[in-house]
Structure formats: C-alpha cells, structure tokens
Amino acid sequence: MRTYILLLFTLFTLETAAQSFNDLCRKGIENIKDYEFQKAIANFEKAEVASTSKHEKIYCLVNIAYSRQMLGDLHGALKSYNKALDINNKELTLIQQRANIYLQLDSVEKALADYNTILKEEESNTGALLCRAHIYTNIGKYKEAWNDYAMLERWLPDNISVQLGIAVLYQKEKKYTECMEMLDNLIKKNPDIPELYLARSNVEREQGYNELALMDINKAIELDPQNASNYLLQAIIYDKMGKKSAAKKSREKARLLGKDSNLLNF
C-alpha cells in the first residue's frame, strides 16, 4: 500500500510540474505578444525551474533572452544565450543569435568567431555571411569582404542589403565613382528607403559635397522622422557649412528623440 501511495504521489507531482511548465510558458508567450517583456521574463524564469528536459530549459532561456533584448538589456540577453549554449553548444541558431548580440555590443572578434563557426557548418547561411562581410568591411579586411559578397551576390543577386554592403565596401576603398553609381541605382529603384539616402549622404559628406549631403539626409529624415541618429548627422553637415544655429536645432531634436549627441563619433 505504501509503495502504491508513493507511486501515486510521484505521478501527481510529475503531472503538476508538467502542467505548471506549460501554463507558465503559455503565459510567457501571451506576455510577449502583449509587449509585457518583464512579465514574460518572470514567467519563463519560473518555467525554467519547472522544466524537466534540456529542450524545455533551452526554450525558456531563448524566450528570456529575446525579452531582455526587446527591453534593451543586451548583456542580459547574452547571458541567457550563453546559458542555453552551455546546454547545447552545437545549436547553430543559438550561436547566430549570440553573434548578433555580440555585434550590437561591438564585441567584433567574438561575433566573427561565432559567424565563422556557423559558416563552417552552413556555407549557404546568408544571414551569417552578410554579417561577416559587414565585419570584414569595418575592420579593413576588404579581400575577405569581397569574397563573402561574391557568394552573396550569387545566392541573393537582387538583395538590397547585399548591394548596399557592396556600395559601402567601395566607399571604404575610396572608389567613390563605383560607390555612387550603385547608390544612385539603388535609390532610383527604391526611392522610399531612408537608409539609402543616408548612405549616399555619408559618401557625399566624406567627399566634401555638403549641400548634396544635406539634401540626402533631409530626405532620409522626411522618410523616417523618428530616427534620432539622422538629426545628429544633419547637425554635423550644418556645422561643416557654418550653420551653427541650424546644427543646434538638429541636436536638440535628436536629444528629444532620445539620442545623446555625445554618444556618436563621426
């Protein structure tokens, strides 16, 4: 009789734990749908404690990482992804998510190491390849960047992000004619994408064509008026043109949108 009672108690405990896990996860998902990320973290942390398998624990940690990322807590998100990878360090999706966080935190070498790991296993992972090409461009490994973009053009011949990346690579190499030809063509085909005007403005500013740069940054602001960084770039152009009052107004607009002018270095 005692053995039978213990068996019933064990089964009841397992069933209750399973239901608790499922209920907590369901609540967490609803929290995410409602943009209640702090509540989502709390529910998934409880679900992690109630989890009974590695798969369940990873599921909780990924949702915690996502919620922290949405709250702007990149270091917290990184911590959760690392915990998940401690459980399964072969999961490429987790490695890619971690690499993306590293990239946002400017931990370039760590991001590059993760993207290399992914691409050794999945040569055709275009997301990882594009990010690696971006890193190579920024750290001055132009030959490696061209190799990555050559593969990306083969797999994604009309992708705007790929074409924009190539234009930036031309800019880094001071090949302004090729760069401007690409950007002009991209803008002609996609006149409503603010990032393209921003990119062309940067090239024009770099060459000293401040009036053209101002026209393009103004267009980028027109298309995306809530992007605070564009107002800071506008202020820099105004400064170069000697328009101090206009520059001050642009910086104030950026500040009101939540961007500290001291955070960016152009």
Where are these regions (language model features)?
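Terminal, low-structured helical/coil segments at or just beyond the last alpha-helical repeat
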Residues: 232-266
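Conserved structural position within tetratricopeptide repeats
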Residues: 46-52, 83-86, 117-120, 150-154, ...
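N-terminal leader/linker segments that initiate helical-solenoid repeat arrays
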Residues: 16-63, 70, 266
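Register position in tetratricopeptide repeats
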Residues: 33-34, 67-70, 104-105, 138-139, ...
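Canonical tetratricopeptide repeat
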Residues: 59-63, 70, 97, 131, ...
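Helix-start (N-cap) detector for alpha-helical repeat units in TPR-like alpha-solenoids
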Residues: 21-22, 54-58, 92-93, 126-127, ...
